[in-house]
Structures are given as C-alpha cells and as structure tokens.
C-alpha cells in the first residue's frame, strides 16, 4: 500500500495530468484515507468505509486518466468499466457482479507478479544450476545412475562465469521444460462468462503441465527455467488469499458513463439497463459478498469512482440511494487553449515529445517551436468550440493531421530537419480550422 501524503500524490499526478486540481485533491485524500484506515485497531477499521467519488465533467478532461494514474501510484487492483455494459439480471448484458470477478482476476495477476519478483533471485540461481547440468552432465556410475555433482568443481565454475557474462547465450542445449497444455476455448453465451471460465480452468487442471525435452538457445532456456522455478517457489493458495485481501482493502473500481444509465424525464415501460442497472450497482457499492472462482469477496471497503459528462442528465437524476453512496462530488472544468498548450509540453512523455522520439527512429529531426505549439493548441480549442467538444483527445487528431506528410515521407527524408512553427501549422491546418464543415469530417 502506498504511504504517500496527499501533497505527494497530487504532485505525482501533476506530472501526467494538467489542471483539475479539485479532482486530484479528492482522489489524493481518498487514497491517503486507505492508509489511515489500515493504521486503526481492527474493531474500528471494520467500521470505516471509503467515501466514494462522483466525477462530473465533459469528455477528454482527465477523469479516466486521474483514476488510472491513482491506481498505479497505489499499486492497487484497478478496473475501469462502462456503466452502459451492465443491465438488470434477466436481460441481455453483463451482470454487475462480473465487475468484482474481473477485479479479482486483476488482483490475482498483480499479486502473482509481485510474488514472482520476490523469488526471482532464488529462481535465477536454480535455473542457472539446471543449465550447467545440461552443459556438464554429471558422470554416471556402473548402474547408470547419475553421481553426486560437484557444485564447486573448477570446470563448473569456469562455465558459470561464462554463463553470467553472456558468452554462452547463443549456444544450444537440450533441457526438459514444462509445456502447458492447449486450453479448450469455449464461446460464452451472454451472462454465462463465469461458468465458461470455470469449465476452462477445469479442463486445464485435468490436462496439467507435461515435461518435454526441447532444444533451445541458453538465453531462451534461462528465461523459461526462471519462470518454471519461480512458479514452484510460489504458494498458489497463499497467493489467492493475499489477492482477495488486496481486492477487499485496496481495490478501486472506476465506473464510466454513469450518466448514461440515468432515467431521463418521464419514461413509461420497462427501462432496461437504466434504473434497473443502478439498483444492481447499489449492493456492490454499499457492501455485499460476491462469489468468484478464487473465493468470496466482500465489497465493503472497495473504493468506487463514478464519472459522467452529465450533459443531458443531471446527478440528481440518479436514484437517491445511489446518490447517497457517492458522497464526494467533484466537478472537472473544460480545458482552455492555455491548458492545451501545457498538455503538449509539460506532462512526462508529452505528445510533442512522443512525435519527436518516433521521428528520430527514422533519423528525422523534428522541432516544435513555442509559437507552433501555441498555434496547435489554439487550433484544437477552436475546433472543439465550433464542433463537438472532445477535450484533450482533439490534440491527437490535430497532431496526426499536422504530422501526416512528415510521417509518410520520413523514410526518404532521413537526415533532414523539420521545424514546426506557427507558419507551418497555419499552412497545414488553417483552411480546415476555418471551414466548419471540413472540421467536422477531418478534425
């Protein structure tokens, strides 16, 4: 669990996301409260539930990115789902409980990676010994049994040194490696994904792993053997228990497009996937127990972050019970031309930095001037204002259009330099930005 302070969390988010300080503060406090809760006595810890968050703001302003970066900082199981994919039980569409099943799968994978990393050093030692055994087979006695190998024989040490220095990487050896059986693919009918997953797991367990003698290069053999030895050192049952604990106490669920399941006005007849979908979400958010293939998972302390543009519906159109389960409301502002300019240059691995690096692979030098960046930002903002506002995603469209010619001809123009200044941007995008009809189709 992350021990970062709210100020440190906001500072880290600032490296990737421009603006939206209120939203960053809200998620930073929510994450720190996770750590604070774990410091409490058991009796009080059970009573402290997370304060779920509702993010309100237009598309492309950073709602999803904030949640995604937060999960990375926390090193916590994280899943993003679309609210519109889930319907009432009995209708075509996924059941909401599959959110927790998918989150548990993510947690198992995350915990497995962490466990493998812990035993990696020991696994590398064991893999090295197996490769040395293949290079220097131990002598056999009169009955054909392998004699006790000499761990520190001078020949073995010479080969060990060469192996560690990479001198034997391309040499081929024959080793016994575990070959997983091909899984049985079962097409799942809607709503029965969990059952088909269990059937697939059953078939794989029945088949098991078989050992097969394979000829391979030493560098490839080492990779395969390290994974095999690490898997032997990891206790799978403990790993599942740890993963479930991780989900229950650190899991984060991001529910996007929650405004699309609001009931709009007076609608008669069955309102499939709207109010029914909200009512199905309620037990998950307020706390229930979900059965997964890894075990039972309680959702009482999972943090839920819901988001929506709320351009047609309003937060008050959500059913009252759900509104009460999302007590923290954060409004994200639409991005200005100045925000676009900062997005192009300030974040780590910014868009302009990415394009410069991509062109360098073709020996083409691309430079973005300050007035060029301002012109790109203004163009993106203007198109957003005159057509549909898609936020920062408009920058991708504008930049792709701007760099189209350079990207296409890069192979023939190796060694050349291009300066993207205001004049270049106007020449490439000026007409498209001014003509609203063209903007709608091309930008």
Swiss-Prot record:
One of its GO terms (biological process) is proteolysis involved in protein catabolic process. It comes from the Bacteria. SUPFAM superfamilies: P-loop containing nucleoside triphosphate hydrolases. GO terms for cellular component: HslUV protease complex. HAMAP family: HslU. Keywords: ATP-binding, Chaperone, Cytoplasm, Nucleotide-binding. It comes from Vibrio cholerae serotype O1 (strain M66-2). It is found in: Cytoplasm. CDD domains: RecA-like_HslU. ATPase subunit of a proteasome-like degradation complex; this subunit has chaperone activity. The binding of ATP and its subsequent hydrolysis by HslU are essential for unfolding of protein substrates subsequently hydrolyzed by HslV. HslU recognizes the N-terminal part of its protein substrates and unfolds these before they are guided to HslV for hydrolysis. It holds the Pfam family AAA. Belongs to the ClpX chaperone family. HslU subfamily. A double ring-shaped homohexamer of HslV is capped on each side by a ring-shaped HslU homohexamer. The assembly of the HslU/HslV complex is dependent on binding of ATP. This is ATP-dependent protease ATPase subunit HslU. The keyword Transcription regulation does not apply.
């Amino acid at each position: 669990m992350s021990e970062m302070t709210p100020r440190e969390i906001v500072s880290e988010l600032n490296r990737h996301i421009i603006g939206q300080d209120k939203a960053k503060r809200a998620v930073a406090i929510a994450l720190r409260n996770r750590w604070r809760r774990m410091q409490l006595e058991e009796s009080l810890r059970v009573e402290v539930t997370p304060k779920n968050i509702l993010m309100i703001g237009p598309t492309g302003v950073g709602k999803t990115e904030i949640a995604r970066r937060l999960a990375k900082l926390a090193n916590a199981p994280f899943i993003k789902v679309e609210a519109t994919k889930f319907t009432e039980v009995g209708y075509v569409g996924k059941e909401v409980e599959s959110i927790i099943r998918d989150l548990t799968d993510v947690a198992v994978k995350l915990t497995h990676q962490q466990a493998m990393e812990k035993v990696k050093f020991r696994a590398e030692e064991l893999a090295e010994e197996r490769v040395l055994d293949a290079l220097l087979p131990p002598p056999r006695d009169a009955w054909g049994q392998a004699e006790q190998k000499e761990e520190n024989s001078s020949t073995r040490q010479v080969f060990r040194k060469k192996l560690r220095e990479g001198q034997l990487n391309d040499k081929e050896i024959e080793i016994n490696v575990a070959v997983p059986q091909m899984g049985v693919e079962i097409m799942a009918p809607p709503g029965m994904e969990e059952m088909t997953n269990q059937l697939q797991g059953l078939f794989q367990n029945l088949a098991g792993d078989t050992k097969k003698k394979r000829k391979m290069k030493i560098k490839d053999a080492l990779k395969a053997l390290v994974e095999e030895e690490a898997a032997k050192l990891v206790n799978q049952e403990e790993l599942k228990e740890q993963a479930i604990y991780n989900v229950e106490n650190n899991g984060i669920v991001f529910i996007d497009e929650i405004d699309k399941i609001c009931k709009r006005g007076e609608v008669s007849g069955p309102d499939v996937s709207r109010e029914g979908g909200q009512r199905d979400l309620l037990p998950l958010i307020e706390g229930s127990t979900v059965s997964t293939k890894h075990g039972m998972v309680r959702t009482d302390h999972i943090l839920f972050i819901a988001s929506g543009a709320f351009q047609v519906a309003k937060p008050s159109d959500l059913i009252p019970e759900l509104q009460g389960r999302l007590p923290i409301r954060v409004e994200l502002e639409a991005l200005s031309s100045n925000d676009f300019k900062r997005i192009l240059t300030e974040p780590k691995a910014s868009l302009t930095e990415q394009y410069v690096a991509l062109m360098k692979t073709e020996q083409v030098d691309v430079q973005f001037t300050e007035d060029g960046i301002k012109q790109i930002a203004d163009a993106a903002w203007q198109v957003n204002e005159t057509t549909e506002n898609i936020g920062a995603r408009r920058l991708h469209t504008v930049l792709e259009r701007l760099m189209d010619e350079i990207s296409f001809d890069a192979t023939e123009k190796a060694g050349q330099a291009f300066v993207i200044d205001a004049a270049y941007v106007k020449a490439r995008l000026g007409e498209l930005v001014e003509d609203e009809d063209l903007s709608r189709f091309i930008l």
